[in-house]
Design a protein with these regions (language model features):
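N-terminal leader/targeting and pre-domain segments
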Residues: 1-27, 119
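Local sequence-structure signature of Cys/Sec-based thiol-disulfide redox active-site neighborhoods
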Residues: 19-55
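Thiol-based oxidoreductase modules, predominantly thioredoxin-like and allied folds used
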Residues: 33, 58-75
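Conserved strand-to-helix beginnings and helix N-cap segments that scaffold or border functional pockets
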Residues: 42-45, 75-76, 106, 110
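Short cysteine/histidine-rich metal-coordination sites, predominantly Zn2+-binding motifs
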Residues: 53-57, 112-114
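Structural alpha/beta surface segment adjacent to cysteine/selenocysteine redox centers
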Residues: 75-88
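Non-catalytic, surface beta->alpha helical segment in thiol-disulfide oxidoreductase systems
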Residues: 85-87, 92-119
Length: 119
């Protein structure tokens, strides 16, 4: 049985980080942070969703979405716990229980996600 692609994170940043580390032990997990009112976030989300369409059902990539306005404490607390500067839009890619890479804004392209996934 395959796992659902999307995961829901706890509101507490430390609990969310633990959940991400656990979920990424056997799959890539991408946290996509976005603002619902930012055109740059809209463009980056489009690129991310285009990349998601290229995945097949067997590809072990899971996704967690964070709305940086509605979930501000989680968005900022998670990056603080990772010692990464908060950005929006921003992708945080976890593999093997660790943060493998992160990037933001114009760097969030379908090609970059494909590269990160090793496809």
């Amino acid at each position: 049985m395959t796992q659902p692609r999307e995961i829901t994170l706890p509101a507490d940043p430390e609990a969310a980080l633990s959940a991400l580390r656990e979920a990424s032990a056997d799959a890539h997990v991408v946290v996509f942070k976005k603002s619902p009112i930012c055109p740059t976030s809209t463009r980056a989300e489009f690129e991310f969703k285009q990349w998601l369409k290229t995945l097949d059902g067997a590809d072990p990539v899971r996704i967690a979405w964070i709305d940086v306005i509605a979930e501000r404490p989680l968005a900022r607390g998670l990056t603080a716990a990772l010692e990464v500067e908060h950005q929006s839009p921003q992708a945080l890619w976890f593999t093997g229980g660790d943060l493998a890479w992160h990037d933001s804004h114009g760097a969030l392209t379908c090609a970059r996600f494909t590269e990160a996934n090793g496809s």
